[in-house]
A protein has these predicted regions:
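Short, conserved beta-strand element in jelly-roll/cupin
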Residues: 78-82, 202-221
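Conserved short histidine dyad/triad with adjacent acidic residue
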Residues: 61-64, 184-205, 219-224, 234, ...
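Short, surface-exposed beta-edge/turn micro-motifs
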Residues: 73-77, 112-116, 204-206, 265
Length: 274
């Protein structure tokens, strides 16, 4: 019999023995066994530890929440920043897979190891990002096109995460070679109809999540937009699958790819650095 939300709250109190709680919820929701790598049943863990991310400001609400249990979300894109599934919902719990995201409005994160909650709260003059400490990418890459308005926020180093690179890239279903990475986040901003530069060089694993506006992640056979062969539409709250493949120890091969902003857009970069 499904467990109601009220019963969930009652039964998940710290007075329950961990083993009893585990058995109770696993019988009702078998997929909870997937959460074994992260023990959110431990009552000694500080739940819902929250802080602002480095790029939070009056225009963008951006929070990191760790050891998440029954966390209410009024309106935000929620990104699962861990190798274990995130559980959302109340009467009808649902899974957000590792490194994926959803858009919650009056929703709840029932359990997660680590999550980012991000929303543009003030769209007017959002394009003034360069005057709020964001950096034009051409200041960092000499070869970057001088006429491309692509801006990067401050980067936030979140902490360490252990994951098998081939599981991250969907090349393997079972972890056989876990590795520790440093998890880093930053935002990007571009106005509509911006070509954000075709490239294929990254010394890290990455995925992206759309926070505001509409864009696309695109793949090419050559560094030429006429060779487009895959067009991944990015609506708000969407995270694409990893583009790279593991080709050696700390070696990732990316296809030629770019982000294209259809409208004024803000998107999140999730980077795993070896």
């Amino acid at each position: 019999m499904p467990i109601s939300d009220a019963m969930w709250r009652k039964q998940s109190g710290v007075s329950l023995q961990k083993r009893g709680a585990r058995a109770l919820f696993s019988s009702a929701y078998p997929w909870l066994d997937m959460l074994e790598p992260w023990n959110f049943w431990d009552p000694t863990t500080v739940k819902n530890a929250t802080r602002n991310l480095a790029f939070a400001d009056e225009f963008i609400s951006a929070k990191l929440v760790e050891d998440v249990v029954d966390y209410e979300v009024s309106d935000a894109v929620v990104v699962n920043l861990g190798p274990s599934p995130m559980v959302t919902g109340a009467e009808h719990p649902a899974i957000v897979p590792p490194w994926k995201s959803t858009w919650l409005k009056g929703g709840r994160i029932k359990s997660a190891e680590r999550a980012a909650l991000i929303k543009v709260v003030k769209a007017t003059n959002l394009g003034g990002a360069q005057f709020r400490g964001w950096d034009w990418l051409g200041n960092r890459i000499r070869s970057f096109p001088r006429d491309t308005p692509l801006f990067i926020s401050a980067q936030d180093e979140i902490g360490q995460v252990s994951v098998d690179p081939r599981v991250f890239t969907n090349e393997a279903a079972v972890s056989t070679a876990q590795q520790t990475f440093t998890l880093k986040l930053n935002l990007w901003w571009s106005p509509g109809d911006t070509d954000c530069f075709i490239h294929n060089e990254h010394p890290f694993l990455e995925v992206h999540t759309q926070i505001h506006g509409l864009g696309r992640m695109q793949k090419f056979t050559e560094r030429d937009q006429s060779t487009l062969y895959e067009d991944v539409v990015m609506p708000i709250g969407y995270s694409h699958d990893p583009f790279c493949r593991v080709t050696g120890h700390n070696q990732w091969t990316y296809p030629w790819h770019r982000y294209y902003a259809d409208t004024d857009s803000v998107w999140l970069a999730v980077e795993l650095h070896p």
